[in-house]
Amino acid sequence: MKIHEECGVFGVMTKEPANVAMMCYYGLYALQHRGQESCGIVVNEDGLFHSHKDLGLVNEVFTGDVLSRLPRGSIAVAHTRYGTTGATNRRNCQPIEVNHQKGHMAIAHNGNLSNAAALRSELELSGAIFHTTSDTETIAYIITRERLRAPSIEEAVSRAMNTLDGAYSLVIMSPQKLICARDPYGFRPLCYGQTEDGSYVVASESCALAAVGAKFIRDVEPGEILVLTSEGLCSRKEHCESRERRLCIFEYIYFARPDSVIDGISVHAARQRAGADLAKTHPVCVDVVVGVPDSGLDAAIGYSQASGIPYGIGLIKNKYIGRTFIAPDARADQVRIKLSPIRETVEGKRVVLIDDSIVRGTTCGRIVRLLREAGAKEIHMRVTAPPFLYPCYYGTDIDSQENLIACHHSIPEICQMIGADSLGYLPVGHLHCLTGHSHYCSACFCGSYPTAIPQGNSKSRFEQRLSERDGALTSFRGYD
């Protein structure tokens, strides 16, 4: 089992009408790793919104025929989703569109609100009717409520930020503007750049800017609101520095693509540093260093360089497996379908295996078994994340301690359960080796949450309540 991140957001503002849908398509492709459940694009054609969104991967949802039906425009927003609140159905696909007395908007969101349940209850008591089970709709309602009293959409967003707690990187489109905002803690990444023709591009990661030929300008600061119009860019920073930065450290460990740079730090380099630290804190006498594709590869190189032990490609990932159907009674075989060992690398050798995390322990146990079947003499597991001990409320699917193996077993017990000869985790106190500073969120490892978490609150309970209500909702036709 791997931890999943909620989603990726993308937006574009051009000086003249252009094929912005295709730009979003390329941007979503670059962000596909952030969400594989659904995706969507909304194009602004002279104030009229045209959208398409559905369940599936980017290339499944946006065929050539679909893209040809989306008009040219000067603004567009896009989203790729892995749901951490809200069921997997078409109603929860983003971007979400909202009509109100002063106009309309489309919103794409990465993250989770830690006060979503309380805000939703408050809104329902005041008469709000929800069409989704996603907390993104709660954000949309809060912004809409403020917009009815505010002189501009950006002012409404600023006022809404006084109410929202938790993680949110937002890209919002109105008839005339593209607005992006990042929560004051900066839990989730957000950056922007510019193409040669002057078009602005906003994305969760810098790799998506490169995918459309945009030059990276900078990250959106925690608490910052960027307003993009046909006349240029304006920055509002009234919420900046109201909180201490707390970017999710797991962005560097696993979520982000290695070719991205987040808050000035190369993801590729951060993973190599984590591997090098593991070589110092958990040395072992072996013959070869092997990384688990994909995020374990950079760390394995770092481990090899720091230890002097040769690096070898010991596992090959099937890049074409996609969302292949696997029968429920054959789930144990899915690792064999996704990964294949290279016998020549591991046979008769002592192997140190580098991976990014252990959640339930089932996947890494099967990988260890694969390598043993390929002839590995010893397998020593090294992990670039500390043990997961606490739920995450800021945009991942770790919703309780129930499925976290480290909550129920000691490290020696886990080592025995996965079948390794030894097991070593990156110490919590060494997480700064990834970033060079301590301004990050590591609540899932240490239980120290930057925001207030209501007593007894859990995303699973919130999800259950919304899902029960979801069964009573009428069918939703969408905006296509």
Segments from the language model and where they lie:
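Amphipathic alpha-helical
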Residues: 141-151, 293, 301, 305-323
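Short, glycine/charge-rich flexible loops or terminal/linker lids adjacent to PRPP-binding catalytic cores
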Residues: 308-352, 361-362, 390-399
